[in-house]
Every structure is written in C-alpha cells, then in structure tokens.
Amino acid sequence: MSYVDSVIESVKAKNANEPEFIQAVTEVLTSLKPVIEAHPEYEAAGLLERIVEPERVVMFRVPWVDDQGKVQVNRGFRVQFNSCLGPYKGGLRLHPSVNLGIIKFLGFEQIFKNSLTTLPMGGGKGGCDFDPKGKSDAEVMRFCQSFMTELCKHIGADTDVPAGDIGTGAREIGYMFGQYKRIRNVWEGVLTGKGLTYGGSLARTEATGYGLIYFVEEYLKCNGDTFEGKTVSVSGSGNVAIYATEKAQQLGAKVVTLSDSTGWIYDPNGIDIALVKQIKEVERGRISEYAKRREGVEYHDGRGVWGVKVDIALPCATQNELFLEDAQALVANGAKIVAEGANMPTTMDATEYLQQSGVVFMPGKAANAGGVATSGLEMSQNSERLSWTFEEVDAKLKGIMVNIFHAADDAAREYGVEGDYVAGANIAGFKKLADAMLAQGIV
C-alpha cells in the first residue's frame, strides 16, 4: 500500500462518522500522489499524517434565552487546522446541519484555498448548529453574544480570524464583534466581513461571486474566448450566487437559473438581478417570489436546476448539491465548464464523470477563493488602519484570482495532468504548505 493510501485508510478508521471530511481528504490526497512520490522527504517527516490532523479542535455549549424566556442550548465548534502559513482563517457557519465532520472538512479545504491566495493565512473553520432563520434580531443577538463569550478565548487578530459563512452575515458578525470587544477590551481585526463603519472592507460582499467569474474569465481568455453570449446556470441565491450572476452579466453572459432550499427558477430572458437582490437581501424572501413578479419565468419545487441547456454551470449553494445524475444532465445539455462557487458542491462521482466527459471542472478551493482573499485584504487594511476604495480591492481581488488560475494551471502541467484543475489546485496549495511545514520542524 502506498504512503498516500495508508494515510487515507487511517483517516477513514479514525473518522468513520465524518463522511464529508473523509471525502475531502480522499480527493485531495489522491490528487497529490505524483508530488508525494517525487518527494520522499514528505513521508520521512510524517507530513500527510500531520496535515490531516487539526492542530486544535474546540467544542463548546452555547446557552441562550429565546423570546419566550426558554433556555436553548446549541453546540459550537472551532477547528484550528493549520497555522503554518499564518493565523487560522475561515468562516463561521450557522446552520442546523453543522457537526464536527462538516467543520473539519471545511477547515481542511480552507488550508489549501488560503495557501493558493499567497496571503499569510492558515486554515480553520467554525460554526454552530443554530438556525438564524425565523429568529428575531434579539434572539440572534443573544445567541451571538453567548457564542462569542466562549469563542473569544481562542481567537485574536494574530491567532485566529473567523469570518462569515452560511447563516453568518453582517448582522451576526456585528453582534459577535461587539461582544468580543466588550469582553477583551480591545479593538482589533479579529473578524472579517465586518460592516464598513467599523473596519470592514469594500467589495467583501461581492468578492466570492466576482472572484469566481474572474477565475472562469481567465480560463476563457487563455483559450481565446469570453463570457459574451454564453448561457449560464447558477444554483443558490445567497451572496455568491447573486454576485456571480451580476458579474457574469456585466461581462455579457445570460444567467438563466437561481435556486434556494425550496426550489428553483428558470428565466429564459436572463435573471433580473435587481429584483433578486430586492427579494433576497431586502425582504429575505423565497426565490419563488421572483416568478410571481416577472413574466415568462418558470418556478419548480425541489431540485432540477442542472437540467437546463447551458454553456457554463456554477454551483453556488452548498456542499454535495450536484450529483452524478446532475452531471449527466449537464453533459447532455452541452455544458462545457463547471466552476464551483460553493465549497465542495459536486460529489466525487459527479466530478469524475464531468472530467471524463471532457467538461472543464474548476474546484471551489481555487475558483471560490475570492472570499477569503478579500478577507485577507480586510485584515491588511485593519492592520494598517486604512480603508481602500472599492476599485482598489476589486483590482487586487482580480489579480489574486488570475494568479490562482495560473498557479493551478502551471502545477497541473508540471505534474503531467494538464487541464485537471482539481489536481493543479491541490498540488499548488500543498507545495507551499509542505515547504513551510518542513522548514518549521515537527510541530
């Protein structure tokens, strides 16, 4: 059994009840085989065994009182995975599905994504099984204050800098930042995704979606093509989906689908992004509202967003949303590119099918790194006590995404897997991390 396979088997045995984590580790380590085989010093230093084991896992209870005066208790997590390249960096997810396996999978992916940005950031992730949907502002505030009362013991501007994620938007970040400042009596850039009035960065909201489009645009440019005239399907209707749609349309594409947890819409004339923003960002409504307010739009309950004829598909909702049958539908409908806006939205068998069918597949750790890259830029602005313009941040974001594309592309060519951006992104992210870990000794 090879070194890589033995580590994967060990991870499966130790983390048997964490399928998402096992999936992420298997995908990454399998793609690293050519690099590992070329560098026996990695095995000698136990590098893979150390990379798959978090440096620290914090799990804690989060008690809070609802509007009826009843005590509620949730479970909070922070997985500090790897600090070799900088302070731990990664979002806080608030969703009923959150468990240790999901947070570990997200934290593991984050190490490589952050490495790819070339900014000084390690990898981590956190969250809680709390659902902010249907809660009052007062309930969300009490939860966030309780959550941060424990989390603040483990984070800091030079230690661990959390950010937003699913369920954690500007409101939640604001409540958490206020509580951190109150307890620690220090104003520092301990969270990113903050409001513009207290240290946030312009273009942070748009960053992941815009960055995804910049990544795909660079691929198209290198192949003598553009977004002009392309038909695009997008899943989700949160920040990533909304701003990927906005930027794609600015570049001449026609986006025809969006979705949420209840169903999806098909607008053959192209999505009216202003209407989507009104429904999702202002009213916090369901995507079905869109079909009621616009002529010629189809609304369908449940799944099915990938059954439409498109050139480019952008899964931007959540992990494991694009299954094998969806991949088959995309190929049958002529999709040429699938780029992940969400974290690991495509199942492993769907990814393999897309690649074998000649579809250009762009993994989330590279394609959606714009969010964490702009978080890194927010950290820089906080450290300097400066605020950059939207145009400055957007230009830096585009530069980072272009560099990430070429890093993944070059790594794939170097190791004989040209055009395989999954392997290329994993190799490029891993090599920087591996060199730093070797330099810092067995820690």
Indicate residue ranges for each PLM-predicted region.
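Rossmann-like adenosine-cofactor binding region
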Residues: 263-361, 366
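Adenosine-phosphate binding glycine-rich loop
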Residues: 2-24, 219, 331-443
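General beta-strand structural signal in soluble alpha/beta enzymes
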Residues: 159-163, 186-191, 234, 257-260, ...
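Glycine-rich phosphate/diphosphate-binding loop of Rossmann-like nucleotide-binding domains
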Residues: 192-195, 200-307
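N-terminal ligand-binding/catalytic initiation module
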Residues: 1-202, 432-442
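Predominant activation on well-ordered alpha-helical scaffold segments within soluble catalytic domains
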Residues: 8-9, 26, 33, 100, ...
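Active-site nucleophile and cofactor-binding loops and adjacent substrate-binding regions
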Residues: 69, 165-166, 201-208, 233-237, ...
